[in-house]
């Protein structure tokens, strides 16, 4: 019997699945509408919900103002971030994702995005107005990882 268990232990393969962002189709549509309404500037938003071992589950979207009013950068004010964080905590949730748009480029992190992703350890959803694509990324262990976006 021990030989069977030892053989099993040696041949057992562990599969580690990446986490996903779970977000409703209506929230995705709201983010896209916000991005298109802010063109040619980048739009931004904070998404609140809960993180589990397997995913980040988005429950609410808070559209925010881009303080930079820029085509290539965005900044969410500390006051807006604090307000959203306070609302999330009252609902036993947390900020689980940062959203912003790229009006004239791909749905992938820019050099500036990567710099800020390293200090904001959330998944980042990026929507490209140019290609109408939405992708999600997280920067962890000095590595950029793409995360799947799933409908709730």
What role is predicted for each listed range?
Residues 6-8, 12-95, 104-152:
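Conserved beta-strand-loop surface patch within small alpha/beta domains used
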Residues 101:
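Short, well-ordered beta-to-alpha junction loops that form the rim of enzyme active sites
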